[in-house]
Amino acid sequence: MEQYRGTTILSVRRGNKVVIGGDGQVSLGNTIMKGNACKVRRLYKNQVIAGFAGGTADAFTLFERFEAKLEAHDGQLVRAAVELAKDWRTDRALRRLEALLAVANKDASLIVTGNGDVIQPENDLIAIGSGGAFAQSAARALLENTELEARDIVEKSLGIAGDVCVYTNHHFTIEELSF
């Protein structure tokens, strides 16, 4: 059975801000099932922002597990991500989940993968999902050649991804942390 999937999630850190944004399209195979899904949210007392790409039900399971890890480790992002990754590798049910998480707080931006990896990307730029490569290319160009704020870079880059990726639309959810 096919899963609901297809999205673009982008995280940009610049100055004293980190922003994660995502589109709202949910696809089942070649069909758009929903256009206004919220794939980005705030976690742990509004100190962490997170976005997901991949199977929708799988991602919600991961959100719940990740939030529980944040609570258990007093909001320590890296520790919570590593503990979730450990569970992901050892738990039979979790190993079958097909999703990626992009998570960030004032100190770090991380990708938690379906293989149980925790990756801190270069330049604190994260792009995941079907339109991730398009959004990442646009964001890198804007980071290197403009003085735009992080939120503006996310908006413009998601817009470009939405123009070229059939699994990405222009209904964005964007969350921002200032520190």
From Swiss-Prot:
Source organism per UniProt: Saccharophagus degradans (strain 2-40 / ATCC 43961 / DSM 17024)
Family per record: Belongs to the peptidase T1B family. HslV subfamily.
Active site: T7
GO terms (BP aspect): proteolysis involved in protein catabolic process
Taxon lineage: Bacteria, Pseudomonadati, Pseudomonadota, Gammaproteobacteria, Cellvibrionales
EC number: 3.4.25.2
InterPro entries from the UniProt entry: ATP-dep_Prtase_HsIV_su, Ntn_hydrolases_N, Proteasome_sua/b, Proteasome_suB-type
Binding site for Na(+): G162, C165, T168
Catalytic activity: ATP-dependent cleavage of peptide bonds with broad specificity
Subunit and partners: A double ring-shaped homohexamer of HslV is capped on each side by a ring-shaped HslU homohexamer. The assembly of the HslU/HslV complex is dependent on binding of ATP.
Gene designation: hslV
Annotated protein name in UniProt: ATP-dependent protease subunit HslV
GO terms under cellular component: HslUV protease complex; proteasome core complex
